[in-house]
Amino acid sequence: MVEMVKWVKDVTHGEMPVIAGNVATGDAFVRLAEAGVNAVRVGIGGGSICKTRIMTGIGVPTLASVVDCYHARLSNTLYSNVSIIADGGIRYPADLVKSLAAGADAIIAGRIFAATLDAPGEISMINGGKVKVYRGMASKEVQEDRRGGLRPGTCAEGVSTYIPLKGKARYVIDEFCGGLRSAMTYVNARNLSGLRENSKFIRITPSALDESHAFGTKQ
């Protein structure tokens, strides 16, 4: 990956922006930054339809990876212009907030948009409800479509599933932006730098996590 980044930057005389990844450690971030990337995708195995960690044993919790890469970026001013993109594990607006507070400049989200009308995917009816097909890019099904099947000696690191249809993507975007704006008021932040400076991460118990959700709806 590092050599490919160097090659692209060389043949384009440094004019083509390059995003590389995915990585899970600050050390990997540094190597890509020194190769000349403009942004690094951070996160291995955290996607909702990814099974890389159970198939390979490789991966770090996405938020921990973001923190590690952010600290690596702070270690040298030469890396300050390299953006961090958190990729994986985004389910709720709070996950966006935590990613940005931990040091990410942006996120990549799949499932939350895959369920919308604006995303590609076949719509079906299952048990009286509308659903869409959601396929991992490393799934067996995608490999069969693109390459005629898995290559010998390889394994699928993703799965395919059906997810309930949500409606238009703009409603999802509005909800996530609303959550971010509200979070910034809670920590008295006027911008993303303020969000990082004013946020504090603490460990919580499973019961505290349960309390964080709207538990009043449970029967």
What are the residue ranges of the model-derived segments?
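Glycine/Thr-rich beta-alpha phosphate-binding loop at enzyme active sites
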Residues: 1-4, 16, 21-66, 115-125
